[in-house]
Amino acid sequence: MRIYSLLILSFLLLASAVLINSAEMPRSEKSLLYSIMQGREDSEEGRCLGPMDECNVFDDNCCAGWLKCNCDWGFAGNCRCSKTPKEG
């Protein structure tokens, strides 16, 4: 019973982290947070194309299909579009 409780708790924590990351923020707060998180920006990375401000590894259209989406935590967190073509 204890293992099931830990599994459910860990799933809920993961789900809440994804929801918090994808939640819409006011534009002023988002731009402030965006400028703080850009300290590691380099010339090989760029902003997403289209209406989205951040890329998503599950949405190829965000990076125009031929660019690769890289995130700090694999699928979320400070996602950036890379100029490297996707493999496969």
Swiss-Prot record:
Disulfide bonds join 48-63, 55-69, 62-81, 71-79. Residues 18-47 form a propeptide. It is found in: Secreted. The keyword Ubl conjugation does not apply. GO terms for cellular component: extracellular region. GO terms for molecular function: ion channel regulator activity; toxin activity. Keywords: Disulfide bond, Ion channel impairing toxin, Secreted, Signal, Toxin. Residues 1-17 form the signal peptide. The keyword Iron does not apply. Expressed by the venom gland. The presence of a 'disulfide through disulfide knot' structurally defines this protein as a knottin. Belongs to the neurotoxin 07 (Beta/delta-agtx) family. 02 (aga-3) subfamily. Weak insecticidal toxin with probable ion channel impairing activity. In vivo, induces paralysis when injected into sheep blowflies (L.cuprina). Shows weak toxicity, since it is only toxic at high doses, and flies recover within 24 hours. This is U18-hexatoxin-Hi1a. The lineage of its organism: Eukaryota, Metazoa, Ecdysozoa, Arthropoda, Chelicerata.
